[in-house]
Amino acid sequence: MIALELSVPVACWRKGRARELVETEVLPPPATCYGALLSLVGEQDRERHRGCRVTAGVLNAPVISTVLRTFWRSKNLKVAKGNDENAAPDQQQLVIDARLVVWCDSREEPDSGESLEDRVVRAMREPGSVTRAGGWSLGESTHLINDARLLPEGRPPAGCRAFLTASTGALTLPVWVDHVGTRGTRYEVGRLEEVLAAPEVQRLPRIPLAEGAG
């Protein structure tokens, strides 16, 4: 298991059913963290490392701000996106100056090639070996990561609140998002728990395998 310590100046990790007020989770869901790790290593196929375990923890108590912004909608297919009724103002919550830890464990990845865990380590230690494009974000493309540090043993630099699986937990976060509809979206139930060391591997949410695999 390895981890990354990250700082993100501005982000919104949108709650799945947020509508008029676009509320944010206090930390990025496993699906968002998985996407960010794929981006770091330059992987464009999100199926590539299914089966790994990923989660996040928050090191501080970031401020939550509310802003007014324009969101695109699909009310009228005859009108261009972002125009007329296909755009409307909404309030959005933003997480300000978040300090995070993102864990990754690849021992359950079925693919025999280089694991996501190993690729993350290589990307941090040998950035010139990675081919990628664009900024590195944790969520929307504007939610850029400012600082990143490898924690090779997975131990956080200080106590943090981590999202860990728990059958009786009160928090449900996506581990896989269906970007076409909602049918294929998968969730994990857990809770935020204070950790001082690398968490138990089996309590990290697992990115689900494709149907029929494994």
Swiss-Prot record:
Phenotype of the disrupted gene, per the record? Essential for sporulation, decreases sporulation 100 to 1000-fold. Negative autoregulation by this gene product relies on DNA both upstream and downstream of the operon's promoter.
Task: Enumerate the InterPro entries for this protein.
Answer: Cas5_Cmx5_DevS, CRISPR-assoc_prot_Cas5_N
> Organism's domain of life?
Bacteria
CDD domains from the xrefs? Cas5_I-C
- Which family does the record assign? Belongs to the CRISPR-associated protein Cas5 family.
Please give the record's induction comment.
Part of an operon going from at least MXAN_7266 to MXAN_7259 that includes a CRISPR operon with transcription continuing into the pre-crRNA locus.
Protein name as catalogued: CRISPR-associated protein Cas5
Q: Name one GO biological process term.
A: sporulation resulting in formation of a cellular spore
Entry keywords, A to Z = Antiviral defense, Fruiting body, Sporulation
Outline what the protein does: CRISPR (clustered regularly interspaced short palindromic repeat) is an adaptive immune system that provides protection against mobile genetic elements (viruses, transposable elements and conjugative plasmids). CRISPR clusters contain spacers, sequences complementary to antecedent mobile elements, and target invading nucleic acids. CRISPR clusters are transcribed and processed into CRISPR RNA (crRNA).
